[in-house]
Swiss-Prot record:
It catalyses: 6-carboxyhexanoyl-[ACP] + L-alanine + H(+) = (8S)-8-amino-7-oxononanoate + holo-[ACP] + CO2. The modification N6-(pyridoxal phosphate)lysine is found at K235. One of its GO terms (molecular function) is pyridoxal phosphate binding. The keyword Transferase applies. Keywords: Acyltransferase, Biotin biosynthesis, Pyridoxal phosphate, Transferase. This is 8-amino-7-oxononanoate synthase.
Length: 382
């Protein structure tokens, strides 16, 4: 039987129609330079992506090292800039060492896959970030997905395993709703059962902990020998890239075994220079971390969300995807840019507006947010 004449991509139209009918079609929307909309959608938590010192850090790095890193860090892409920033970030977070990757996504892939593998067990929270989910899938380890924030289920998985090596992976702050992971309890369980804990601090760095050092710092686990921290440079630090922090033995192993590190071009100097400058601003101005949480509380109050947020994220669940998308568009039309999360990013029936507070929000910005959200949410909740 032949299938000559069949288009190998014809199925894409059918899938696109199904997504459109379910209200789940995505579209790219251009963000204008210097736009006037109040930004409650970006992850620029500390408002550092446009900070003069951060911009100058990027420019200075380009002038000294060039526009690109020119190769893998194992060939020509490793510079004094990369290693100096790694030392600075490790010192800031209390880790023994750090290794920079080209993105937070590849940092998670590299760490989880290289530290697990066949014959090991990975225990993952049901709501971990997609990069951790994909890392578990690629690891060839046995994977147990536990209910959200369920420490008892984690302990059961570890206690009943046959594998010698076991790793528990989690976000510190879950990105869709801003809820904190019970890191101290999770670490206690890991310690009892000889498991490694890998924590993605993408939404914790710059917001939680002393001066924004992260949730691991806040719960007393900074630099713990059985904890590996991953994070992005694209949120609180306003740049781009990712990093894995932990014991020196972990760094050495990743240089040998993490494929996203070995076979990827090193992070561009501009991104490293910007992230390093942002880190220096955070060290000089630790109050920025507190400002994020204070502004998140103001946004939660504007949305009638009863609890004070634990992070920069304020989640307003509206239910169906069409309702959430219409609300996000209505906000933008009134000068307020908000996030809109729909399945498969969040479970069916929980489509939502996702607001992210930033340290740089002004009183006028918050007044605009209160006015627009009151109008839009009243209509959306009818």
């Amino acid at each position: 039987m032949t299938r000559a004449g069949l288009s190998p991509l014809a199925w894409l139209d059918e899938v696109a129609d199904q997504r459109r009918a379910a209200g789940l079609r995505r579209a790219l929307r251009t963000r204008p330079a210097g736009g006037t909309a109040v930004d409650l959608a970006s992850n620029d938590y500390l408002g550092l992506s446009t900070h003069p010192r951060v911009v100058e850090g990027a420019v200075r790095a380009v002038r000294e090292w060039g526009a690109g890193s020119t190769g893998s860090r194992l060939v020509t892409g490793n510079t004094e800039l990369h290693e100096g920033f790694e030392r600075a970030l490790a010192a800031f977070t209390g880790a023994e060492s750090a290794l920079v990757f080209s993105s937070g996504y590849t940092a998670n892939l590299g760490a989880v896959v290289a530290l697990s593998g066949p014959g090991s067990l990975l225990v993952s929270d049901a709501l971990t970030h997609a990069s951790l989910v994909d890392a578990c899938r690629l690891s060839r380890a046995r994977v147990v997905v536990t209910p959200h924030r369920d420490v008892t289920a984690i302990e059961t998985a570890l206690a009943t395993r046959d594998e010698q090596r076991a790793i528990v992976v989690t976000d510190s702050v879950f990105s869709a709703d801003g809820v904190l992971a019970p890191l101290r309890d999770m670490h206690d369980v890991c310690r009892r059962h000889g498991a490694l804990l890998i924590v993605d601090e993408a939404h914790g760095l710059g917001v939680r902990g002393t001066g924004g050092r992260g949730l691991l710092d806040e719960v007393g686990l900074a630099g713990a020998p059985d904890v590996v921290m991953t994070t992005t440079l694209s949120k609180a630090l306003g740049s781009q890239g990712g990093v894995v922090l932990g014991p020196l033995a972990v760094r050495d192993h990743l240089i040998d075994a993490a494929r996203p590190f070995i076979f990827d071009t090193g992070l561009a100097p501009a991104a490293v220079g910007a992230a390093w400058a942002a880190l220096e601003v955070l060290v000089d101005e630790p109050s920025r971390a507190r400002a994020v949480l204070d502004n998140a509380a103001a946004l939660a109050q504007a949305c009638d969300v009863p609890a004070r947020p634990d992070s920069a994220v304020v989640s307003v669940i509206l239910g169906e995807p069409e309702v959430a998308l219409a609300a996000a568009i209505a906000c933008l039309e009134q000068g307020l840019r908000v996030g809109c999360f729909r399945p498969p990013t969040v479970p069916a029936g929980t489509s939502r507006l996702r607001l992210t507070a930033r340290a740089s929000l002004t009183d006028d910005d918050l007044d605009t947010a209160r006015r627009v959200l009151a109008d839009v949410l009243t209509a959306a909740r009818r």
